[in-house]
Structures are given as C-alpha cells and as structure tokens.
Amino acid sequence: YTGSQYNFNKRNKYKNNINPGHGGSYGNYENEVIAGNLFNYPYIHGKALKENGYSFVSCNKEAVTNGMASIIDYDMIDLILGEEKETLTGKNKRYKTFPKELQIALQDYLDMGGNIFASGAYIASDILENENCEPDDVVFLKTILKVGLGESKFRSNGSIESANSEFTSFKHPFYHYCQVLNEKKYAVEAPDALIPANGSQPILLFGNNPGAVAAVAYKGKYKTVISSIPFEALTTEYQRNKWMREIIQFFETK
C-alpha cells in the first residue's frame, strides 16, 4: 500500500511514473509499513473475556447462518464486525454485516432474553446507506439492535469518552482507538457516528465531538451494546479488558 488510488478511469494508459494511468495512487506511504488484517480478532476478544473470568468459543457467521452452530444457549454473543461491509467482489456482493439468515438467528437469540455485544466501523451505514437495503433490514437495525446512523465516515481524533446514562456499569472516563495508519494495528479511519433508537441510550461519545455517539446500550427483555469502534481497535490491552468488564457487568445486572 503506497497511498489512496486517484485514477479510476480504465481507459487511461500508462505513460510514465508521473502519469501512471488507471490504478494510479498517491505515494505518501511509500516508505511506511502499514499493518493489515492479522485475523487475530477472536484471540483479542477472547483474551479480554478470559481476563474477566469467562471462557468462550468462536465460530464464523456462516456456521451460524447455515445451522452448523447454535447460539441459543450462550449467555452472551460477541459479534466481531471490524471494518466489514457489503463489498462488490467481481460480479457478486459479499461481507454484508447482517445477512438475512444472521438477522433471524440473532433475533431468535434475543427473543430468548439474550445479550449481544456487536462492534464494527460500519455497523449502521452498511444497512442505512446501502442502495440494496430492504425495509426488514432497517427494522432489524433500529427495532431489534436499537441503533441508528447519525453520520457515516465520521472523522475523530481517536478518543472516546463515557456518556451520562442511567447504565452505571459504563463509567470508565475515556478510551483511545487507533485511527491513523501505522505498522502495528489496523486503523479505523472513518467509523459511523451512531444515534440511539427505540429505547437505547448513548454510552460512549467521540471525544472531539461530544454530540457524536460511538456506542449505545439497550436494556429491556434483552440487552444490546452496539459500538462503531471495533473492540480490537482499542489501543491497549488494559482498555480492552476494562471495556469488556463493563459490558459483562451491564449484561449481568438485573
């Protein structure tokens, strides 16, 4: 990776290094090492669970949607979405955050009084700004998960802080997440700014704009914590352990 692509015209041919034609990219990262996806997120999430005294098992979404794995009997679901969003690959679209089969499985789980923690940079915009979105997708996001979209591609300084809410489990004053490209951890450069929906409350705010919401929580027949900051993007293990502890305490509080 050398920088953002600026030439997308397939008719532009290579002339020289100054005019490279189609596929031309900026070179501002030519001398930098940029961290990619290490696919170690189940380990990072699982380690935080273990540090808080809990065991865990992991599986991919497809194992749930095709019936190979059942989530009904678990006290808590930690849904890892990272920077996943529906993407055109060749002629097909893949990586939708909440495909229909997953929506059904999660709703069945919540109907049994379950607890879901879901974190992903595009957790709201992948549905609400998707031209192929269906009414049922919007209902699932806003009515079941209890979250809406305030602004997509939100620019932050990488700090998030606790909001004033009735949920006393969430009291850690601030966290930091990685938002700048670097060699150690993948960066979340432009996450969603969220809004509460159907009874949820803000629990984390972006530090550079206290009106912008980074996470919401809902307590009713079931409980949800929805964050646009991927859990694994928090910069230190201490912060991840603390955030996971607060989520667990919220789920366990009657």
Kindly give the residue locations of the regions a language model identified.
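A glycine-centered loop/beta-turn motif at secondary-structure junctions
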Residues: 115-118, 148, 173-254
